[in-house]
Design a protein with these regions (language model features):
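Catalytic cores of RNA-modifying enzymes
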Residues: 1-147
């Protein structure tokens, strides 16, 4: 990561495993819904592929420098937007300004805030149709215990 001038902070962990990337993309590519919200796109490890399979794409990135970089990279695509926001406290109803109807939430969530982010979106009246997220094993086990 140092060679790419990346300095993970804020609990970030950057997705580099090609097998995991493929699993995530395969999980959403055949769905009828093509509105995709990506939480924490970071350097854009799966962003291109998500954009290729979506009608509307919105990325929420907390790191201002990464958000600016991604916004510049995709500025010519009118169906792609990035917001510099904290997904854990983001007003989910604002999504309707960018994604007009049902959406799928995809993300490689920061460990320290994954619970807060997931709860923010599933407790909203504008819930995602599906979540395809990578989270810490202990957080996943905690969700399973509550079901």
């Amino acid at each position: 990561m140092k060679q790419n001038n990346l300095k993970p902070k804020l609990g970030q962990h950057f997705l580099i495993d090609e097998k995991i990337k493929k699993i995530i993309i395969d999980s959403v590519k055949d769905t009828k819904n093509k509105n995709i919200l990506e939480i924490g796109p970071g350097e854009g490890a799966i962003t291109n592929k998500l954009i290729d399979i979506s009608n509307n794409y919105l990325g929420i990135e907390y790191d201002q420098s990464l958000c600016k970089k991604l916004s510049g990279r995709y500025k010519k695509n009118p169906n792609v937007k990035f917001l510099n926001e904290d997904a854990g406290i983001f007003d989910v109803l604002k999504l309707k300004n960018y994604i007009p109807n049902d959406y799928i939430l995809v993300g490689n969530l920061p460990y320290y805030s994954s619970n807060k982010i997931v709860r923010n979106f599933i407790s909203s009246s504008f819930k995602p149709l599906a979540l395809v997220v990578m989270i810490q094993k202990e957080v996943a086990n905690n969700y399973l215990l509550k079901i």
